[in-house]
Structures are given as structure tokens and as C-alpha cells.
Amino acid sequence: MAYQGRYNNKPSGKARGGAWKIVLIVILCVVLLLGLLLGAAYFYLESKLNKINRATFEEKDVSGQDLSALIGNLDESDPTISISETTAPTQAPTEPDYGETGKMINILLIGQDGREGEEAKLADGIMLFTLNKETRTLTTTSFLRDSYVKLPENYRGHTCGWNRINTSYALGYAWYGSAGAMEMLNLTLENNYGVKVDGNIELDFSAVVKIVDAMGGLDIELTGTEYTKMLEHQQRLNTQYETLGISWYRWIDIHEGVNNLNGDMVLAYARERHIDNADSDIKRTVRQRKVINAMLSKLVTLSPSELNNVIDTALSLVTTDLTTDEMKTYILELTPYLFDLKLVSNQCPAEGTYWGEMVELPDGVGGVLKIDFDANKRILQAVMNGEEVEGTAIQ
């Protein structure tokens, strides 16, 4: 009989089949585990997004008297803001050519000046977030609220003429509620700058305070004049609390340089426009972008439990016109870029493309910013495409 060496033994078909069974079982277990994790993540995301308030259209019977509280005296039967053609600036072409979903995602953040329990009013802050997936850039563009723009010519039967950009939000809200405010502001941006907004997020003053506090405050660097102004603000708040009979106030020690500011202080910092004689709405929007960047920087440092608390707090305080499916799509698109984004700060109108002028407004003569819309449309497109433009700040 031929010698059968130990290296000549072949595994039986039964043994080979058993090995394959083990491999298949392992693969099946991995697939099931991934399925469970994805399912849990899906339901987690769904439960969180369901906490967000939804913008709704509410047709309102608004008199000229009610509108005058927001923007001045208007005729009750025809709420038209008229301005002569000789004083109306040239408007840019209205055909939008960027900012649609695909290469870019545009989400508009609206900070409105209504406080908790109050009706929403003017848009105190208008900030556009543009994610460019090709250049991995997140651009934050602040729109100056005194910008003199053409409002939609015929918004659901209402004609509006020319006015400050934040009035667009106020009129939309007065006529059709939160969804109307967002829609009218979006149309105003598209008609004047060619910007296509994919979705809106709105929050009021009280929301900012609560969200920042949930994050444990924000690290903000104060200049000497900013420190002086913030100290005055703390003293005013403390006096107000005492007047109301509230025995506590979250007094914090601040100084020139980097400070961890609580929600009250961050809100005051972001809204202040008279820190010194040279201060203006332009510097105010710079401070607002600094706050946003500080929030983004803080978020990535939070533990899972801290982040979950911030998410729960924030989602219940904001209002959006996005559907749950749209939000999930944008979140999934954003996630791969979250830790590898170049942040760019931008202002619209850009420096050198606008000038101050006194014009006739519904509530009398007022100062506005007249704008070279063609130049700003070109600059916006360049910045959103990831090009370096003088006057923008890259981080």
C-alpha cells in the first residue's frame, strides 16, 4: 500500500462545507448587526427630527394699522410700498444659476426679533449657509438688514415695492405666518441676488440663549471696547432681574480676550451694533458669524451625552419648512464633510458695492444701503464656488 504522508491528507467535503457554513454565519451576523445599527440610527434620527416645529401657512386678516406697527403706515385696502423709479436702484437679473441641490446646498438661518410668547416680527439676522460638496467649503453669508431691495412684485396678491430686506420677512409673516415669512424672504433673495434657498431654519432670541447655555457657553474673544459694552450689559441685566424680584443672575467674570460667555451674553454680543462710534450693522454681522463659528467649533468637542442634550434643546426651539425626509437627506449629505470643512465668512452686499442713502419709506425718510446687485451676484457666485475673494475670511 502506498505511503500516505501527513501532508497528503485532503480535507473531506464535509469539513470544507462546515468551514463555509461558519463563514456564511459570520457574514450573516455582521449584516444583521449593521442592519440593527442602521435601523437604530434611523429611528434615533427620526425621533429627533420630529421635535422640530414646522412652518405653516396661516392666511391672516391684517389691517394697515397692524402692519404699521412693523413697517410704517400703509393703506388698509392696498398695502403697497411705492417708490419713484428715479430712486429705485437697478435690479440684477432674476434668473438663478447657482445654489440648487446637487453641487451646493443652501440653508437660510433667520434670527427673528420676537421674544418667547410674542409674534414674530422683523428678521434681525439673515444668514445663508452654503455647503459646496466639491470644494468641501461651508460659506456663511450675512445679509445686511438695511439692504434696500425690491420685494416680490405680486406676492399672493400683495404688491410691495422697495424696502429694507428684513421687512420682507415681516410682511410675509403678517400675511401668511411663518411659512409665508420664509417664502417671501426666499423670493426676495432669489429675485435680487439669484440665490436659490433649499430650506429655512428660524429661531428667536430666547432660543439662542437656551441653546448656548445647553452647550456650556461659547468661547468668544472680546476687544477692549467689546468688553466694556458687555460689562455694561451685565450690569443692566442684573438691575432688571432685581427689579423683577428675581434673586439670582448668572453673573460671569469677563475680561478683554477670550471669555466663556453664557447665553444671555452671547445674544447681547451678537445683537450689539453700537459698541463704538465706528460700529455698525456690518460689524454686528461679523460678530454673528463669529458666534456661529464658535458654535461649530464647540459642537465637535462635546461628548455624546452632551451633544444629545444640545440636540434635544435646539430642535424643540427652531422652526423649519423642510420635511423630515429632506432634513435626513441633507444630514446624510453633510455628515461625510463634518470634520473636514473649510469655513468661509462672507458679507452681502460686499465692501465697495453699496452706499448709504436717505430714501422715502412707509414710516418716513430713512437711511438704507443701496446696492450694485450685478456685482454682488458675481461675488456671491464666486465665493460659493470656493474661489478666494477679497473681503472674505477663510478659517
Annotate the PLM regions.
Residues 30-38:
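Alpha-helical transmembrane segments
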Residues 14-31:
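N-terminal Sec-pathway targeting helices
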Residues 2-10, 20, 37-395:
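Non-catalytic, solvent-exposed segments at the cell envelope interface
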